Amino acid sequence: MPPKKGGDGLKPPPIIGRFGTSLKIGIVGLPNVGKSTFFNVLTNSQASAENFPFCTIDPNESRVPVPDERFDFLCQCHKPASKIPAFLNVVDIAGLVKGAHNGQGLGNAFLSHISACDGIFHLTRAFEDDDITHVEGSVDPIRDIEIIHEELQLKDEEMIGPIIDKLEKVAVRGGDKKLKPEYDIMCKVKSWVIDQKKPVRFYHDWNDKEIEVLNKHLLLTSKPMVYLVNLSEKDYIRKKNKWLIKIKEWVDKSDPGALVIPFSGALELKLQELSAEERQKYLEANMTQSALPKIIKAGFAALQLEYFFTAGPDEVRAWTIRKGTKAPQAAGKIHTDFEKGFIMAEVMKYDDFKDEGSENAVKAAGKYRQQGRNYIVEDGDIIFFKFNTPQQSKKK
């Protein structure tokens, strides 16, 4: 089947946030809610997890492989010499406290660390433990969530004022017509964030030009959030905690569409210390499972990332792209020559490959597609790119 001509891909929606695939998600919360323990079990690292505020001062950064049964299946089929999954970049940020936007605690330094991230794991504590102090004196995850939201909101309000003042000076009083649209857009942002007291991400009708301006300033409330609720081991196993319903109701009302994922840092730490066989027995005996795979996948998706596969006996690899990436740009992730000389993308859907059992069987079933440069790559596509070089045509 020849590659489809122009128009074989819809225009992808604009995305608020930094452009690229090396994006980071930061673990944010009050001190002593379990952030460093979570970071340790997530990344198998040993960041300090002491029982006092601000034990994490410089953010710890690591990357974790994204678990995917599709990747595992392709590796089983091809038995490749090299296996490279997709990765999620995770940053452990020190605990925020009330008044951080005014410099309380380690204040502005922490907020700048959040600014350097592209998404947020908002971790809150819903377990009681007399040995672990709470910076606010009691366990109340709703209050804690609201403190974090307020600090991010107030920091954005603090940032917006000087931006508008500068634009007004140049675009309005100075008559710079090129900057007038940006000034108008920032006034709209001010109305939403400051006057209506709403985060940037809650407004779903930003147009392309507005998103372009938002991406220039990268406000904290524009960053997507995944809410992680740290439970005791007992509560996690029995799937019961007095705060869970209240947290879900708060998020549904205040951050509609955001995910709430319960987990237990204590359980995950215990599982990590067991052998693989002991871990499996423990999980089966307690009829439970680790929440980490779900959390990693949720963080990856929150950053608007996905991946396609290249697969063969030499290598099975997941190539990370932003949602909405077209075939030539996806090819460029492998090598710039692939994008410059792009001819077509030969695409198999993962489910078709799994159902049919081989590439030849997919072709025989008429499910092997040749796509042109307007094709928008879909998550899990298995792709072979054809491209031209000055010397010859090649295929990978």
From Swiss-Prot:
Mg(2+) binds at S36, T56. Residues 304-387 form the TGS domain. GO terms for molecular function: ATP binding; ATP hydrolysis activity; GTP binding; metal ion binding; ribosomal large subunit binding. The keyword Nuclease does not apply. Transmembrane segments: none annotated. Residues 23-283 form the OBG-type G domain. Its main location: cytoplasm. The keyword ATP-binding applies. GO terms for biological process: ATP metabolic process. A motif (Nuclear export signal) lies at residues 267-274. Pfam families: MMR_HSR1, YchF-GTPase_C. It is found in: Cytoplasm; Nucleus; Nucleus, Nucleolus. ATP binds at N32, V33, G34, K35, S36, T37, L231. The modification N6-acetyllysine is found at K294. Keywords: Acetylation, ATP-binding, Cytoplasm, Hydrolase, Magnesium, Metal-binding, Nucleotide-binding, Nucleus. GO terms for cellular component: centrosome; cytoplasm; cytosol; nucleolus. Its cofactor is Mg(2+). PANTHER family: OBG GTPASE FAMILY, OBG-LIKE ATPASE 1. Monomer. Hydrolyzes ATP, and can also hydrolyze GTP with lower efficiency. Has lower affinity for GTP. Belongs to the TRAFAC class OBG-HflX-like GTPase superfamily. OBG GTPase family. YchF/OLA1 subfamily. This is Obg-like ATPase 1. It comes from Rattus norvegicus (Rat).
